[in-house]
């Protein structure tokens, strides 16, 4: 039996691009689309409801990470076997959804990332030079920290197996942009298999993009995250953030049995 595929869209003022993003989704592969609105001031909610999406609304702008927390929690409640995050700003190609879920369906990966740096020249596709080179540097640093060899971690196009989202404690993560890297670090700490596919990217006026200042803060927070991860991995300072929930519950059950409380 094929897993239930649910697309989640973390949205903030996406009225101009939401419809075109949704229309390009290959519906034959998707059982449900969940949109979480993070305090938009435009017509995002109205358009989402017009498209018959399942809509959840934050009463104010809590942040990109907070939006994803609601996305994944609601997708799991809805019985998703595979959860695909698609930004509603049309920056990533929705038609590549079959490719991004296939490694999970084939049992080859628990998390698949859509890499813009594997697809050719991101600079030619419009990625700002400062964003391109900082992406390359941070990805190299993460590869060193994680012991992996991927071409990009800073993508908003990603697919998760249900079991991975149940294992990582994503509720402990930031409500901001660094959530994207925290959940990857958690996946690595849990021993998840991570794959990637090449995806093109579009940069245009309506597409959302972090400013230079936001990107600088994001980069500094990644450095702090990697320091915490390395300390956890080496055993110098264990962090609950990187512990598998499955293992924690199993350890708790064993402890209760040992003390005769079960």
Which stretches of residues belong to each language-model region?
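Short, well-formed alpha-helical segments that are part of the catalytic scaffolds
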Residues: 12-27
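A short, conserved beta-strand element in the Rossmann-like catalytic core
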Residues: 39, 63, 91
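Short hydrophobic beta-strand elements that form part
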Residues: 6-10, 57
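Hydrophobic helical membrane-anchoring modules
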Residues: 1, 147, 171-262
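Short beta-strand-to-loop acidic/aromatic patch adjacent to the donor-nucleotide binding site
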Residues: 80-91
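Acceptor/aglycone-binding surface of glycosyltransferases and processive sugar-polymer synthases
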Residues: 58-77, 94-177, 204-223
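Donor nucleotide-sugar binding loop of glycosyltransferases
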Residues: 14-17, 40, 93
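A conserved acidic beta->alpha catalytic loop
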Residues: 37-45
């Amino acid at each position: 039996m094929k897993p239930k595929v649910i697309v989640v869209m973390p949205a903030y003022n996406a009225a101009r691009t939401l419809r075109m993003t949704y229309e390009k989704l290959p519906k034959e592969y998707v059982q449900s689309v969940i949109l979480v609105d993070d305090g938009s001031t435009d017509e995002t909610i109205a358009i989402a409801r017009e498209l018959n999406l399942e809509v959840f609304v934050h009463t104010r702008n809590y942040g990109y990470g907070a939006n994803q927390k609601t996305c994944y929690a609601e997708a799991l409640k809805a019985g998703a076997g595979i959860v695909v995050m698609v930004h509603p700003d049309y920056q990533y190609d929705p038609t590549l959804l079959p490719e991004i879920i296939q490694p999970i369906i084939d049992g080859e990966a628990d998390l698949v990332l859509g890499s813009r740096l594997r697809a050719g020249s991101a600079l030619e596709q419009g990625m700002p030079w400062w964003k391109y080179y900082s992406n390359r540097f941070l990805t190299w640093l993460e590869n060193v920290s994680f012991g992996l060899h991927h071409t990009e971690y800073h993508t908003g196009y990603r697919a998760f197996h249900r079991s991975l989202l149940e294992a990582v404690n994503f509720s402990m993560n930031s409500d901001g942009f660094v959530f994207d890297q925290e959940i990857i670090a958690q996946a690595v700490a849990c021993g998840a298999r991570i794959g990637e596919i090449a995806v093109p990217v579009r940069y245009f006026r309506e597409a959302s993009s972090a400013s230079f200042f936001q990107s600088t803060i994001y980069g500094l927070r990644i450095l702090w995250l990697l320091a915490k991860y390395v300390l956890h991995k080496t055993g110098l300072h264990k962090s609950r953030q990187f512990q598998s929930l499955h293992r924690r519950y199993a350890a708790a059950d064993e402890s209760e049995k040992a003390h005769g409380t079960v």
